[in-house]
Amino acid sequence: MRVLVAMSGGVDSSVAAARMVDAGHDVVGVHLALSATPGTLRTGSRGCCSKEDAGDARRVADVLDIPFYVWDFADRFKEDVIDDFVASYERGETPNPCVRCNEKIKFSALAGRALALGFDALATGHYARLSDGRLRRAVDADKDQSYVLAVLTAQQLRHAVFPIGDTPKAQIRAEAAERGLAVADKPDSHDICFIPSGDTRAFLGARIGVRRGAVVDAGGTKLAEHEGVHGFTIGQRKGLGIAGPGPDGQPRYVTGIDAATGTVRVGGAEDLDVSRLTGERPVFTSGAAFGGPVECQVQVRAHGGLADAVASHDAGVLSVELRAPLRGVAAGQTMVIYRPDPEGDEVLASATISGAAGR
């Protein structure tokens, strides 16, 4: 099989490439250049493509004796990931850019080019498993990345390979060291790759500018003025611009964002509890949509826990009734539906959260 391996320059994709070589495949490595100014991207095995990362990937390819290329996807990345990220915050949402990158860049633009060039599959260093075309959680639950892959269609998954999903991260590092790969101890990066400072509010403010609005309590009383809804997310406690706790002495959190009026609503922790979710743009990873109701578990954050729920689908809307309330769920987040399975929880579907209500 002719396999293109996406090599970030980190330990995970490096071992993935090595395993593809060991399996006897015709392997080519590719590193994605995602910025016109590479120094602005964070480095690390979860980072995206600084000059240092490209050099690390090339050195691994040399050790493995495989062809290696750097492909420029900067324009596509800006349009489909960065611009989308900014626009989502302008709408008062909280997006996950890693989900978008997998959907639009790695497994659409990159995979599409790979297939056009005659490759049979795209391999990556994601922690996830595929069995009989079904996407499952990785063996290493702490590193599992099935959540950020749940936007992939059955067609995309048919050409995907995840060589390290059956191995714990510690073992991957040990294997890299045994193979003599210099990236064996390279640290992971857990922040947004195109915001190296980690200051999301400043990044958004520089692109959106000042759009003043009011911070109000549950009764609509104005408490403060802000410089844009893009500086807030549901569940946020710090940086609200208000003095002290609420009248009950308890902390106040962002409980609602109305981008149309520029209003940010705050309330108590209990006001963050939701028991019903709705999602747009559903994707069914096996290719078959379910109607409902389906007993399942739902995850609403990349590193969040699983919550028992019942899911149903009708007219392009994915609806979830939670068995117990979840706290601080924001529009724009991805919700992923899992079917519990002793062989590895199976991803059934995903959708972009458009509504959260009830307690």
Curated annotation (Swiss-Prot):
Q: What is its main location?
A: cytoplasm
Q: Show which residues form the site (Interaction with tRNA).
A: H126, Q333
Compartments it resides in: Cytoplasm
Q: Which UniProt keywords apply?
A: ATP-binding, Cytoplasm, Disulfide bond, Nucleotide-binding, RNA-binding, Transferase, tRNA processing, tRNA-binding
Which top EC class is named for this enzyme in its record? transferase
Pfam families per the UniProt record, alphabetical: tRNA_Me_trans, tRNA_Me_trans_C, tRNA_Me_trans_M
Catalytic center residues? C101 (nucleophile), C193 (cysteine persulfide intermediate)
Reaction equation(s) it catalyzes = S-sulfanyl-L-cysteinyl-[protein] + uridine(34) in tRNA + AH2 + ATP = 2-thiouridine(34) in tRNA + L-cysteinyl-[protein] + A + AMP + diphosphate + H(+)
User: What's the EC number here?
Assistant: 2.8.1.13
- Provide the function of this protein: Catalyzes the 2-thiolation of uridine at the wobble position (U34) of tRNA, leading to the formation of s(2)U34.
Protein name per its UniProtKB record: tRNA-specific 2-thiouridylase MnmA
Query: What organism, scientifically named, is this protein from?
Result: Mycobacterium sp. (strain JLS)
Q: Its gene?
A: mnmA
